[in-house]
């Protein structure tokens, strides 16, 4: 069975963390992108579990570097740019408040 690409918006919150736990045991989805406001300090640990991640987005950061990630999106339009570059991926929105509606 071909795995579906998945983008996880809001990886640092409780819904995002529960999703990451579930994805570790799942063979239907391949996590290819994660997004958060500013929680950059968690990325390396997530990359250890999900080396399939090629895209990371932070709407609240203006600079971030990580040699393990192919595509890094920053700023106000970071989430939209990541979605546009990963056409066809399933999007799981775990963002809270108004950020989840934008």
Which residue ranges define each predicted feature?
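Glycine-rich phosphate-binding loop at the start of an alpha helix
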Residues: 101-102
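N-terminal glycine-/serine-/threonine-rich beta1-alpha1-beta2 phosphate-ribose binding loop
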Residues: 1-98
């Amino acid at each position: 069975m071909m795995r579906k690409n998945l983008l996880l918006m809001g990886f640092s919150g409780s819904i995002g963390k529960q999703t990451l736990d579930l994805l570790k045991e799942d063979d239907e989805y391949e996590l290819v992108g994660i997004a958060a406001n500013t929680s950059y300090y968690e990325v390396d640990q997530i990359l250890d579990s999900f080396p399939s991640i090629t895209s990371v987005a932070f709407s609240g950061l203006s600079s971030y570097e990580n040699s393990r990630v192919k595509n890094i999106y920053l700023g106000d339009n970071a989430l939209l740019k990541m979605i546009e570059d990963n056409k066809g991926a399933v999007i799981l929105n775990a963002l809270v408040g108004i950020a989840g509606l934008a």
